[in-house]
């Protein structure tokens, strides 16, 4: 391993730059730098040489040309193991550059601004930065490239431990990370430019929709023992910049490694539970809620959710949107086996009780508002892309289409079961009362079959459906679903409407004395 003698540091994100440069200086490394980075280091007392002074060529064209010079790129790309390269570099006075620390213009932050013009976006496309990054990454056997400031402490420690040298393994891993960095950067630029509207040449073009060429980057979190089934291989990746409050931000506090199915089910549970503004519990099995409830505290919410379907809850995923206390965890562990327990926070007592079940996976996930920009679904040879279903309704959005108006309690229950239905696989029917699901019918090819299943679930749980409310994620194609609901004693229904037989459905509600409200919004989930 050869010691690093000269480094070039030019950063947009300067986090930790001063401390890292101080370490390099102590190791006798000569530091080249540009613009704001050079000023930051100089102000901190770190000796730096401006790139313009090093090359003898001034920065020009409003900063567009700073590092695009043979003395820079020759110093990065030259192979120390080839006599011809060494001779040419000596002939032209090109010295080795052994370490490059570069991250790129903040293009994402620029285009996120509401009044970003095309000119603003173009001017924030980095040219010199990616060129140096790729040059250093290509020549990894002789040059180290650092693109992530989070790597500074580990790199500094290795340099100090090895007399200013980095191992081949470290340099190769940094190279791989660098190429991923530039690929993600170029993909982001492509996504932006190919998604602009037809008025792209106007001052402030609008994002028309989906990119003409869709580029996405993810970072591997873990390889898994297997996929959905034992004969399938699998891994879990997270977005480069995960949406606020998304599952990918989880912190595992205890338990076995998460499986493919654990993560899929945990995501379904988390998306559902965080949609409630009051304390809530969601129990999920095979990506479907089998029990949901809201209450004044987590213990009561769990008891109500569990009571919906004690059989299906076995081996399920249990999610809360409030801090979970010891009493709640004790009740859960006394009642059932679970795969995953998740919440924004747990008390010390809760964690102590959970620790007795060492295989249970306990996750803390930040409770923040946010959603993925796109939802993706692979099909054979292609990809379906859509915006997430984040639509929420209030009482003011609903239209009563029956003769009978809902009571105040029914209004509350209708909004509750409607929200739950959004997270149930279609065809979805949800019965509930008093902030508790009484029966959930999911994933059936016929809506009336889902209705019958929801009724049977309530019956099996010993829950009286008289006076309960029902939600359907899509319209009733025939009145038969309403008739089955009426047989259970349910007195209020919420659904989108939109069927060619809507009037027959509305008339059926009136025949049964049911209050019926429509949303005008469908919540299919496949």
From Swiss-Prot:
Keywords: Hydrolase, Multifunctional enzyme, Purine biosynthesis, Transferase. Belongs to the PurH family. Pathway: Purine metabolism; IMP biosynthesis via de novo pathway; 5-formamido-1-(5-phospho-D-ribosyl)imidazole-4-carboxamide from 5-amino-1-(5-phospho-D-ribosyl)imidazole-4-carboxamide (10-formyl THF route): step 1/1; Purine metabolism; IMP biosynthesis via de novo pathway; IMP from 5-formamido-1-(5-phospho-D-ribosyl)imidazole-4-carboxamide: step 1/1. It comes from Neisseria meningitidis serogroup B (strain ATCC BAA-335 / MC58). Disulfide bonds: none annotated. It catalyses: (6R)-10-formyltetrahydrofolate + 5-amino-1-(5-phospho-beta-D-ribosyl)imidazole-4-carboxamide = 5-formamido-1-(5-phospho-D-ribosyl)imidazole-4-carboxamide + (6S)-5,6,7,8-tetrahydrofolate; IMP + H2O = 5-formamido-1-(5-phospho-D-ribosyl)imidazole-4-carboxamide. The IMP cyclohydrolase activity resides in the N-terminal region. Its EC number is 2.1.2.3, 3.5.4.10. Residues 1-147 form the MGS-like domain. PANTHER family: BIFUNCTIONAL PURINE BIOSYNTHESIS PROTEIN ATIC (PTHR11692:SF0), BIFUNCTIONAL PURINE BIOSYNTHESIS PROTEIN PURH (PTHR11692). One of its GO terms (cellular component) is cytosol. This is Bifunctional purine biosynthesis protein PurH. GO terms for biological process: 'de novo' IMP biosynthetic process. SUPFAM superfamilies: Cytidine deaminase-like, Methylglyoxal synthase-like. One of its GO terms (molecular function) is phosphoribosylaminoimidazolecarboxamide formyltransferase activity. Pfam families: AICARFT_IMPCHas, MGS. PROSITE patterns: MGS (PS51855).
């Amino acid at each position: 391993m050869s010691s690093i003698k000269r480094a070039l540091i030019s950063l947009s994100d300067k986090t930790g730059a001063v401390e890292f440069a101080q370490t390099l200086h102590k190791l006798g490394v000569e530091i080249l730098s540009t613009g704001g980075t050079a000023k930051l280091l100089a102000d901190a007392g770190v000796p730096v040489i401006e790139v313009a002074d090093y090359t003898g060529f001034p920065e020009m064209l409003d900063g567009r040309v700073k590092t695009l010079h043979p003395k820079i790129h020759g110093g990065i790309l030259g192979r120390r193991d080839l006599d011809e390269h060494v001779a040419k570099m000596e002939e032209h006075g090109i010295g080795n550059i052994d370490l490059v620390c570069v991250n790129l213009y903040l293009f994402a932050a620029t285009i996120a601004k509401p009044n970003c013009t095309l000119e603003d976006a173009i001017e924030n496309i980095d040219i010199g930065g990616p060129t140096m990054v790729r040059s250093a990454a290509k020549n990894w056997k002789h040059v180290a490239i650092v693109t992530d400031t989070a790597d500074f402490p580990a790199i500094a420690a290795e340099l100090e431990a090895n007399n200013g040298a980095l191992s081949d393994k470290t340099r190769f891993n940094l190279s791989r990370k660098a190429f991923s960095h530039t690929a993600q950067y170029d993909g982001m630029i492509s996504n932006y430019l190919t998604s602009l509207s037809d008025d792209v040449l106007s001052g402030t073009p609008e994002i028309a929709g989906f990119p003409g060429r869709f580029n996405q980057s993810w970072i591997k979190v873990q390889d898994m023992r297997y996929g959905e089934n034992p004969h399938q291989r699998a891994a879990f990746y997270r977005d480069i910049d995960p949406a606020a409050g998304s599952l990918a931000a989880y912190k595992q506090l205890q338990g076995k490694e998460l499986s493919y199915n654990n993560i899929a089910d945990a995501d379904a549970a988390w998306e559902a539970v965080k949609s409630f503004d009051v304390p809530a519990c969601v129990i999920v099995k095979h990506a479907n809620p089998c029990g949901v409830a809201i209450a004044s505290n987590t213990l009561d919410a769990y008891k109500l959710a569990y009571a919906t379907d004690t059989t299906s809850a076995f081996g399920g995923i249990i999610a809360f949107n409030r801090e979970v206390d010891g009493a709640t965890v004790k009740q859960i562990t006394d009642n059932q086996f679970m795969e995953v327990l998740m919440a924004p926070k747990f008390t010390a007592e809760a964690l102590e009780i959970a620790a007795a079940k060492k295989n249970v996976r306990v996750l803390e996930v930040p409770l923040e508002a946010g959603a993925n920009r796109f939802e993706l679904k692979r099909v054979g040879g292609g990809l379906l892309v859509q915006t997430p279903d984040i639509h929420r309704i209030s009482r003011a959005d609903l239209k009563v289409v029956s003769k009978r108006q809902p009571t105040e309690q029914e209004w509350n229950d209708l909004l509750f079961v409607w929200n739950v239905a959004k997270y149930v696989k279609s065809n979805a029917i949800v019965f509930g009362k008093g902030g508790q699901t009484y029966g959930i019918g999911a994933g059936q090819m016929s809506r009336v079959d889902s209705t019958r299943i929801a009724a049977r679930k309530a019956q099996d749980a010993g829950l009286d459906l008289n006076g309960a409310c029902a939600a359907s994620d899509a319209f009733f194609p025939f009145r038969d679903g309403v008739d089955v609901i009426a047989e259970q004693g349910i007195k209020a229904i919420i659904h989108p409407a939109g069927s060619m037989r809507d009037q027959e459905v509305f008339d059926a509600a009136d025949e049964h004395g049911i209050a019926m409200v429509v949303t005008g919004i469908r919540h299919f989930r496949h």
